[in-house]
Amino acid sequence: MKLGLSKENLSALTLAATLHDLGKTRISIGKPGKLTAAEYEEMKRHTIYGYESLKNILGIPPSIALTALQHHEREDGQGYPLGLKGNDIHHHSKIVARADVFHMMSSNRVYHQAMPFYKVIEQMNSDMFSKFNPEILLEFVSRLMSTLVGKEVRLTNGRIGTIIMINPYDSLKVLLKTSKRIIDLRMEKEWQIERIIGE
């Protein structure tokens, strides 16, 4: 991997990603709507609950519990629960944070609808030098887009096409094949990828 993870670290990261929201099992809030300020503060404590549940389990690396604690921390110190910055945040926590936010923005939730795919990527890019580590973000987007070759997508104009090539310099400006022609989104400035079909 470009992020320099050994097989051992990758295995630990996989487990950390699987368990990062374990603390939510101790949260009893299940309302189908926007949380009150008090409810939101309680929801934020899932990071601490997860850490407390994992930190003393024998046989798992300390990074697993740290990821549960830190996956809502941000590079600029505006995250929670500790307001950590930059190098004070564990590397695995930074990677899981990026994937967690992508999943949140691109999924339907009781309190918001999924954002169009292109808006998710644009928002991620805008956060590159503030909330998230730029190296991790670039690697995440690169690997994400590479998995979409051969996938069907719906454009903002309603057309459906299959991605056949990714532009390495502008990830959203892909080359697509529709039933009638090839579309190069570098040339079609007003068209964007709205969603991945089947995702």
Language model feature labels by segment:
Residues 1-198:
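Histidine- and acidic-residue-rich, metal-dependent catalytic cores
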